[in-house]
């Protein structure tokens, strides 16, 4: 595992990402690269029944509570994968393009936002491990002034690109906390909107955006829906 996997702005713990991404110096949309050894381990993890159930529970929760936004994620990822068959989803039928495993042994995040994710999009956070959630490991949403007990096995969806979040420390060195984080980089949607090319290539070819930034944001917020719409869609 490289130095960047254990020293990063989100916390003092090992973390490894897998999936489809664009940004951070990439020239085009692609699969995150790993050594053959790490790739084999990640493949085994992603193919395990337990991990597939955990990941797809988060995906199905996303579909249930944010159906329009989920469709946008899923349709964009489908378009990317159809255009480039080399792209590989982490989990079949899952709308999230990428996942990060926070490996701990005490994965306690610093205050941060995931500013490269889709601004109005959702990030699924699932806590794992063995710790007392009444005494530590809480999820803190700073902008909402909320401290949430977050036991192992809990999943939450938050707009992590714009909402500052972190974790409370664990109280015992014998406790362990890990996490599965699922998300999609904003650059993927920008790439698709630019006709599956970079913004620079799009503009050089005389491309004109169908919407202004303000219009795009309004459209994005409209995908979140409201409580009355959620109730009306359920029996």
Regions found by a protein language model. Give the residues of each.
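Anionic coordination/interaction segments
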Residues: 1-127, 131-141, 145, 151, ...
């Amino acid at each position: 595992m490289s130095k960047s996997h254990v020293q990063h702005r989100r916390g003092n713990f090992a973390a490894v990402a897998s999936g489809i991404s664009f940004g951070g110096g990439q020239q085009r949309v692609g699969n995150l690269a790993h050594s053959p050894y790490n790739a084999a381990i990640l493949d085994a993890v992603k193919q395990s029944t337990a991990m597939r159930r955990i990941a797809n529970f988060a995906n199905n929760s996303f579909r249930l509570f944010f159906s329009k936004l989920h469709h946008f994620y899923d349709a964009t990822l489908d378009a990317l994968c159809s255009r480039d068959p080399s792209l590989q989803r982490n989990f079949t039928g899952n709308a999230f393009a990428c996942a990060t495993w926070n490996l701990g042994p005490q994965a306690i995040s610093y205050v941060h936002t995931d500013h490269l994710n889709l601004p109005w999009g959702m990030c699924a956070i699932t806590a794992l491990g063995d710790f007392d959630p009444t005494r530590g490991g809480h999820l803190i949403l700073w902008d909402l002034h909320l401290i949430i007990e977050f036991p192992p096995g809990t999943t939450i969806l938050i707009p992590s690109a714009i909402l500052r979040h972190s974790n409370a420390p664990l109280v015992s060195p014998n406790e362990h906390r890990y996490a599965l984080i699922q998300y999609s980089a904003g650059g993927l949607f920008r790439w698709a909107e630019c006709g599956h090319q970079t913004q620079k290539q799009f503009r050089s070819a005389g491309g004109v955006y169908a919407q202004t930034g303000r219009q795009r944001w309004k459209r994005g917020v409209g995908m979140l829906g409201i409580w009355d719409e959620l109730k009306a869609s359920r029996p």
